[in-house]
């Protein structure tokens, strides 16, 4: 079998096709033909362009970047025997995932076989890879993966943000799918819950877990606090939304020597506590003004014990939100009043604002408007007021993670029916989000997001050329744009060599 060998002559590097032959009991190389030479690290063919044919053009740029990020944190080694198939699914979820049965044809349009060993890829192999994920000890595996990320990126996380989302399933026979509170407010869909913890600064995922669709948000954190305790992180701040807060969660996190910063629902007890301070004219004084990004809050801070845990409670007034909520309700009430005058039915829930004859009741309306625009947050650490607000209200990094999971990585809708395949599908999406978050971190000093960078690299193809006359094959990456060079440099300058 022939191959290409380099020869140095007079300071230049030449390429020749040679083949091994056995002569006199020894293996010797026989010159077949001159191929070309190297100049500035590039191959210059001796053949005429008229003899060259384009054999194939493959998608290369996004996959090169994703595979580089995965290899840096030793993801292929950690995934074991089915790593090649699993990584192909992960990369597809980042770029252009549709379904398992579409994967073999999608693979043919990409240069994944240059990066992964996927010769003869079939849907059956991919299903086998999904099954292998279910055999993993997911909790221990996620911890080891995160430890590897911290080592490579030299991270010492001091803040964690936790949140829960749900997604629906097409199939109705999966035991995980249960009726629950759909965060998209669509009724009648079977749901699963996904809890996700990310680092507060970088947005790197620490852990995730899939729950039945009818599990309360606060209960999901109860299950995951024990897992979080095994990570051995130095004490920091655990941040989560008001739907997750509970006395047990506060105490469990405190036992780990971590502090809590969380939202708290404004129930009747808290309304009674805050009523002496909730007068907008009293609260909206200049010393109480705090800016968080484009939003203005007026705040009041008081010591408080929440389920026996000491901390400080902040009442936050968003005057703009108060005005919008109040005017939206009044529009609905006035429209309902006109419908009642015509003897027509009104929107459920608005009846309490009218008497039996359809006359408006000012008392219930004023009561409903009393705490419009107010929110409440609780913190067990003594933070400056502005920092307390910015840390809580700027926690959209986990919301961006969920948008990435649901949008870019195609978390929803889940088309699998078997519970183990649902777990595996979410796990694939979790790994895809991990790579996207690593990419976003590497691009933090550029104008690009992870999604826009992958889109820009989508025109970075590899062309396979064949010399029809001498049956010589060569691959070349198409010329890079300026933006593509910026992206590759931001990730790793060594990737620029991959274009040669």
Language-model features and meaning:
Residues 388-415:
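Short amphipathic alpha-helical "interface-anchor" segments enriched in bulky aromatics
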Residues 239-248, 266-269, 420-423:
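Acidic, metal-coordinating catalytic cores used for nucleic-acid/nucleotide bond scission
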Residues 192, 207-210, 256-391, 458-500:
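An anionic, glycine-rich sequence signature occurring as long contiguous blocks
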Residues 418-439:
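Basic, amphipathic alpha-helical segments enriched in Lys/Arg and hydrophobic/aromatic residues
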Residues 169-176, 206-208, 248-252, 271-276, ...:
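Short acidic, glycine/serine/threonine-rich loops at helix termini
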């Amino acid at each position: 079998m022939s191959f290409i060998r380099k020869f140095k002559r007079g300071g230049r590097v030449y390429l020749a096709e040679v083949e091994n032959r056995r002569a006199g009991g020894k293996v010797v190389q026989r010159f077949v033909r001159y191929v070309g030479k190297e100049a500035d690290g590039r191959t210059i063919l001796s053949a005429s362009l008229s003899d060259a044919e384009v054999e194939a053009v493959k998608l290369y740029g996004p996959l090169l970047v994703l595979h580089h990020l995965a290899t840096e944190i030793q993801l292929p080694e950690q995934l074991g025997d089915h790593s090649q198939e699993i990584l192909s699914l992960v990369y597809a979820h980042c770029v252009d995932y549709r379904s398992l049965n579409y994967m073999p044809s999608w693979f043919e349009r990409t240069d994944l076989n240059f990066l992964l060993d996927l010769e003869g890829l079939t849907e059956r192999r991919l299903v086998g890879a999904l099954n292998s994920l279910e055999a993993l000890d997911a909790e221990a595996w996620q911890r080891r993966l995160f430890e590897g990320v911290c080592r490579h990126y030299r991270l010492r996380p001091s803040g964690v943000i936790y949140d829960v989302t749900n997604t629906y399933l097409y199939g109705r026979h999966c035991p995980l799918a249960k009726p629950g509170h759909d965060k998209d407010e669509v009724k009648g869909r079977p749901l699963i819950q996904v809890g996700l913890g990310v680092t507060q600064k970088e947005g790197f995922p620490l852990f995730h877990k899939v729950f039945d669709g009818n599990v309360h948000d606060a209960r999901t954190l109860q299950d995951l606090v024990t897992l979080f305790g095994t990570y051995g992180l130095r004490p920091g701040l655990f941040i989560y939304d008001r739907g997750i807060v509970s006395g047990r969660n506060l105490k469990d996190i405190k036992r780990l020597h971590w502090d809590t910063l969380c939202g708290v629902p404004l129930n009747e007890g808290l309304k009674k506590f805050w009523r002496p301070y909730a007068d907008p004219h009293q609260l909206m004084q200049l010393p109480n003004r705090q800016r968080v990004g484009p939003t203005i809050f007026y705040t009041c801070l008081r010591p408080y014990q929440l389920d026996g845990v000491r901390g400080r409670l902040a009442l936050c007034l968003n005057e703009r939100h108060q005005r919008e909520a109040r005017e939206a309700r009044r529009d609905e009430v006035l429209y309902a009043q006109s419908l009642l005058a015509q003897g027509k039915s009104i929107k459920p829930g608005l009846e309490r604002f009218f008497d039996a004859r359809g006359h408006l009741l000012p008392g219930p309306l004023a009561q409903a408007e009393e705490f419009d625009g107010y929110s409440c947050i609780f913190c067990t650490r003594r933070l400056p007021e502005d920092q307390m607000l910015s840390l809580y209200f700027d926690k959209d990094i986990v919301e961006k993670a969920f948008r990435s999971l649901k949008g870019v990585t195609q978390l929803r809708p889940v088309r699998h029916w078997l519970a183990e395949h649902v777990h595996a599908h979410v796990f694939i999406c979790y790994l895809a989000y991990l790579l996207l978050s690593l990419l976003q971190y590497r691009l933090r000093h550029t104008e690009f997001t992870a999604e826009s960078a992958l889109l820009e690299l989508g025109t970075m193809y590899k062309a396979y050329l064949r010399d029809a006359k001498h049956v010589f094959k060569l691959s070349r990456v198409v010329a890079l744009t300026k933006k593509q060079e910026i992206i590759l440099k931001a990730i790793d300058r060594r990737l620029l060599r991959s274009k040669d």
